[in-house]
């Protein structure tokens, strides 16, 4: 993709159609569900104790691949700071069944099971995850597929990018705020090539992530 986002790259496949009629590419992308599906999920959230009048974070504290998960204890520290600084925010953990669920519940335990975290709220299908996105104020955590879905529903995101993942490719820029924190922000290519992935991840400190998150949330308010 070079310096282009994956969205721009994929839209480029339509360029041969320019011979028929000029194509005006757009940067916006959306996922649509029915109003009934959206209302149904909103009701479910309320039944789980979520106050829809207050901000909600969807936190991606884990991932399918261990190589795409930032240090767990650092994540716990950042979320603890967030809860102290923004006590009115509600937090939902994004996780799949199996190891991801185990990881998410371990993070929940390490946090001390705060009332701000609604650990049992789940989207049980891709369409429900889209529905969830329309109620989220912010997506935060490890970069991954769920972030793209949230972006398509208009949910702003701040993510930690795994080493080797080009954030300009995976964080398309449009009207929805989307920012990433990556090792490439902190060291040049000559330095990074001498480091393995865990060493590159270690460049991303908890203090840096917290300052970025705090500033991002303050801009949203």
Predicted feature locations:
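Catalytic machinery of carbohydrate-active enzymes
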Residues: 1-221
């Amino acid at each position: 993709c070079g310096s282009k986002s994956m969205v721009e790259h994929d839209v480029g496949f339509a360029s041969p159609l320019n011979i028929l009629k000029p194509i005006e590419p757009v940067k916006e992308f959306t996922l649509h569900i029915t109003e009934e599906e959206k209302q149904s999920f909103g009701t479910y959230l309320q039944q789980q104790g979520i106050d829809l009048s207050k901000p909600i974070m969807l936190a991606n504290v884990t991932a399918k691949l261990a190589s795409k998960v930032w240090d767990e204890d650092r994540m716990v520290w950042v979320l603890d700071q967030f809860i102290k600084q923004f006590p009115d925010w509600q937090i939902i953990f994004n996780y799949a069944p199996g190891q991801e669920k185990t990881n998410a519940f371990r993070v929940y335990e390490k946090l001390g099971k705060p009332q701000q975290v609604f650990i049992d709220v789940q989207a049980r299908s891709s369409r429900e995850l889209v529905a969830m996105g329309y109620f989220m104020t912010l997506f935060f955590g490890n970069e991954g597929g769920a972030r793209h879905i949230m972006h398509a529903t208009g949910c702003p995101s701040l993510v930690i990018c795994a080493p080797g993942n080009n954030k300009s490719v995976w964080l398309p820029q449009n009207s929805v705020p989307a920012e990433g924190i990556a090792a490439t922000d902190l060291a040049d290519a000559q330095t990074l090539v001498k480091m393995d992935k865990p060493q590159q991840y270690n460049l991303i400190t908890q203090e840096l992530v917290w300052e970025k998150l705090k500033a991002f949330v303050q801009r949203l308010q």
